[in-house]
Every structure is written in structure tokens, then in C-alpha cells.
Amino acid sequence: MRTLPLNGSRNSSRLPTLLLAAGLAMTPWAPALAAGMEGMDHGSHSMPMGASSDAPAQSRTPIPPVTDADRAAVYTSHSGHQVHDSAINSYFVADKLEWQDANDGSALAWDLSGWIGGDIDRLLLRSEGERTNGKTEEAEVQALWGHAVSSSWDVVAGARQDFKPGAPQTWAAFGLQGQAISDLDVEATAFIGDAGQTAARLEADYDLLLTNDLILQPTGELNFYGKNDPQRGNGSGLSTSEFGLRLRYEITPQFAPYVGVTWNRSYGKTADYAREDDEDVAQARLVVGLRLWF
């Protein structure tokens, strides 16, 4: 038989391809290779249509520059005072302006205070007293310098002038005032008077919010003296105490009528002086009054 050469036939160009396909089909790993090709995700190889579409769009509204007014607003306190404010401010309150039903007649009592100055240093003014049946029984005025030592406490120093009882008397005063806890106001003041007389006073009051407008206020005051003073009816040690409970209704924050009751008591030699003058050692009083501030 005569054999034709491979390059001499018309189909000679297809023979290498057929032989390669037959050889691959006969290999043992051909099925695994085919399965692997079928499991490939050919769609993941597609190129994104527009890469620039994924970038965030830039705002067409320009951001305005920060102004001095913007910077100042950052440091503005909600209470109306600037940080380290040097402006002069003031506050005055008639904490007690009341009529009292005393055992020996009706009485008018007051407890006023206020300040004027800056956030750190202030002039403090205080006054309290009582008139019974048209006669002044007690009256005093204090003028103090106050210096803030923290956000809640001030040290105070100045002078106190007594007009009644007895002859007028002048005291040097120094102490602390502030808030021990929220809404608990405390004043602790020591006094040095004429002829080596000394005294101390501790006052506290607390505002208990019953509703937005109804407030119950317990109060307390203790007075101490270093030595006996028969002319003014003050004995050494714990001299007098006064505790009160007042319920006020705030028609506005600046105007609040109230009703309440107080308990007054004298101790030791002070009580002895009261008995000698036919005065009560202890008594309870019904009170009606107004609380004002501006």
C-alpha cells in the first residue's frame, strides 16, 4: 500500500488538533480539569463600566469661613455669662418678706441679700431683722467682699452692723457661702465684735421641687456667742435656733407667695435672759409672705 506524506493531503492541517484533543481526553485528570473550568465565575472578570461613578459627588455649595461671631458663640455660657467674664452683673433677692403670727402680737420679718460684681469677685449685701407690734426687735446689715474659690463656694470677709437689740454694735465678719449639694445653700460666718465678743452663725436652706411651680423649702439657722452679753440678751454657747418650713407657689420665677411655719428656741443663758424679760423661750409661728428677686 502506498502511504501519502502528512503534508501532502488537503486535511493535513487538521490532524495536529485532532490528535491533541484525543490525547487530552485519554488522560486521567481530564474530567477534573473540565469540572474546574465549569465552576469558575467568568463574570467577575468583566471590567467596570465607569470607575468614576463610584467616587462621591463633591458639594457645589461652598463651606463659609469661620467668623469671629462663630468663635464667640462657642464660648458663650447658657447662664448668660461669658467664660472669664469681666462684665458687672447683679442679683438681689428678698428670700423672706413675711408676716408672722407671734405669741405677743404680729411681727414683720425680712431676710434680704444680693450681690454686684463679676464672676470671681463681688460685693455682697445682707440684711435681716424683725419688727413686732411696730417696734424693731432685731435689725442688722452686712457688707462683704466675696471671692470665688470654686464653682460652688465663695470666701467672704467684711463687716456687720447690728442696730437692735440693745446698743448698736459693729463686727468684723469672715466665712464661707455656697452649695453643699444641688439646691442646698449654706452660709457659715464668724464674727469678732467689741470688747472681744465673738459669734458665729450657720444658715442653710433647701428647695424641694414638688411640681414645676410648687416648692417646699426647709430652713435652719443656729447662732453662737463666745461670752454672755446681758445688754443684748445673748448667752454664751448655742444661743438661739430657728427652723422653718415654707411652701411657695411661683407665679413667675421672680414672684412667689408662700405660707409656712417656724419654730424658734433660746438656749442656756439666752433662755434665762428671756425669762427675766417675760419673753417666750420657745414658740411656733404661722408665716405668710412673698419671695422676690431681680
Swiss-Prot record:
Keywords: Cell outer membrane, Copper, Membrane, Signal. This is Copper resistance protein B homolog. Residues 40-60 are annotated as: Disordered. One of its GO terms (molecular function) is copper ion binding. The keyword Signal applies. It is found in: Cell outer membrane. Residues 1-34 form the signal peptide. It comes from the Bacteria. Exact function not known. Could be involved in copper resistance. The gene is copB. The keyword RNA-binding does not apply. Its main location: membrane. InterPro entries: Cu-R_B_prcur (IPR007939). GO terms for biological process: intracellular copper ion homeostasis. One of its GO terms (cellular component) is cell outer membrane. It is a peripheral membrane protein.
